[in-house]
Amino acid sequence: MYIRRTTIRSRQTGQPYYTYRLVESIREGGRVRQRTLLNLGRHFAVPREQWAALVQRMEHLLGGQPDLLPAELDTQWEEAAQRYAAQLIRTRASVQEGRAAEAADYQSVDVDSLELLRPRSVAVEHVALAAVRQVGLDRKLAALGFNGPQQGAAIGTLVARMVAPGSELATHYWLQHHSALGELIDYDFLGLDLMALYRISDQLLKHKGALEGFLYAQERTLFDFEEVITLYDLTNTFCEGTAKVNANAALGKSKEKRSDCPLVTLALVLDASGFPKRSEIFPGNVSEPKTLAQVLGKLTAEHTGNAPTVVLDAGIASEENIAWLVENGYRYLVVSRKRHREFDPDAAVLITQGDALTIRAQRRVNADTGEVELYCHSSQREKKEQGIAELFAKRFEAALEKLAEGLHKKGTVKRYEKVLERLGRLREKYARAAQYYEVSVEQDPASGKTTAITWQRTKPIAETLPGVYCLRTNEADWDEATLWRTYTMLTDLEAVFRSLKSELGLRPIFHRKTDRVSAHLFISVLAYHLVHTIRFQLKAADIHLSWEGVRRELAGQDRVTVTLKRADGKTLHIRKATRAEPRQQVIYDALGLSDRPGRTEKTIA
C-alpha cells in the first residue's frame, strides 16, 4: 500500500487542487495496475515525509500488531493511522456481509493475541437515532435541502445534545472520540470540521418554524392524541460573559438566581401530552404577560376545530391576556392573581387524599364575570406557607435582637430617631411577620438615645386561609376534579424546563451572537422533542424513568473491535456491540429495538 497524490481541476472554477488516495498495486493478466483502497480527500494533512511511516503503521494495525510503532512516524499522526486502518477494515468487511448469519464460522486463532480496540458508546445513541427516524426528522432534513454531510452533522448535533450536552467544541470531541454514532449512520465524524457544527446550528435555526410544525404533526400522528389543552410558560437562562453583541441578552430577574449575568428568555407552548408545539426566544428582561399574544397568535390560524383550553400561571394571567384569549376564541384556566381567598371546608369536594397530600376544592360562579372560580386547599401548600411564615418570624426576631444588642456596643445606632427609622425598615422588610408583634422602644430624654427595645408576639402566626389558592376559568362544564387535574399539568411544563436545563444543556450559554444563542436554545428544544418521544413510549410500557435515568441504565454498552491472529498469519478483525445487559434489554424491548446496535463487521487482513 502507498499514498498517491493526484491533481484535479475544479469543474466550477477551473482551478487545480490535489486529492489523496491510499492505493495498492495488483497484477492482473500479466499487467500491474493500481487499486484504490481509500479516498483520503483533499484535506489530507499528513506531510509527505510521513507517508511511508503512516502506511507501515496501518499495516501493523491491520496485521494485529497494534503495539508496534515505526520510529519514523510522529506520535501526532498515530490517531490518523488508527482512523484510516479502521476505515479500511470497514470497507473490506462490507464485502463479506453477504454470508448467512446462521452459518457457523470456525477459525484457528491464537487466543493470546486477542486485542480489544476502539471502544465507543452506542446504546443511548442507538435509542436516540431510532427516535430521529421514528419521527421522520432525517427525511425532513433532506426535504429542506440538507445534503448528506449536513444531515450527518445535524443528527450528530442533536444526538450529542441528548446524550452528552455541551459546547460545540465538546460535542465535536465526543462525536470523534467517544461515540459510535458515526457507525450507525455511516458518517465519518473524524473528518468533520469543528466549524461545520456552528454552521449546522445556523441552518437548523433557519428552518425553525418548519421543523417545529413538522415534528408536532408527526408526534400527533404517531401517538394519536387530541389537541385539547395548551400549556404556556416561560423560563430564562444565563449567558457567560457580557454578551454585548447579543440583542436578546439583558439583565433581569433570574429564575436560577444568576441575576449577575445577562439573561435570555425561552417561551414554550406544550400540549397536554407534553409535546412542544412552538417555542420563542425573548430578551432576558421581557415582561412575561406581554409575550402571550405574540406566541399564541401564531398558532391561532393553525386551529382547524375548536381552539384548545389554555392553561397559564399567575405571572402571565393578566386581565389583558384573558381578554385576548376570549377575543380569539380560546377557553382558559388560569391561576387567579387576586389576594382575597375564600374557602368553606363543608362545601368543598375531596379531590385526592394521601399521606403526603390532600386536596379539597370548592367551586363557585362569579356573579360579576360569569367565570367559574375554584378555591383549592392543599395540605402540602398549607405546611409550606406556615413554614415560610415561621421562617420570616425568626428572621424578624433575629433582626430585632441584633438591633437591641447594638444599643450596648460602640459605633452602633443608638439615637432614638435613627432606631425608629431602622425599626420601620425592618417592619417593611418583614411585613408578613411584623403584623404579629408589638415592639416597644424606650428613650432616655436627657441624652436622646434609646435605652431598650422589647417585643412580644401578640397573636399566633397564622396566614389567612393558609394553603388556599384560586383558579379561574370559562370552562363552565368541567367539574372540580377535572379543573384541578388540568391545572396541575403546569407542573409537567416546569419539569420540561428542568429537563432542558439539567439534562439537555440549555444552560449556561457560551455564545455571543444573537443567532448562535437562539440556535443553542432551539437545538435543546429539538432534542427535547426526541427525548419526549422516547419517554412517552417507555411510560406506555410502565417504565417511568427520567431522561437522566434512561441514560444511566443504557450506559455501558459499547461497540468494540476484537483482533485475533490466525494460524495462517493473517489477522481476524471483528467489530460489534457488546451484549445488552438485562436492564438495557428491558428498554430495547419497550421501544421495539434490536439489542445489538450496528452491524457485525468481520475482516481478515
Language-model features and meaning:
Residues 45-104:
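N-terminal helical hairpins
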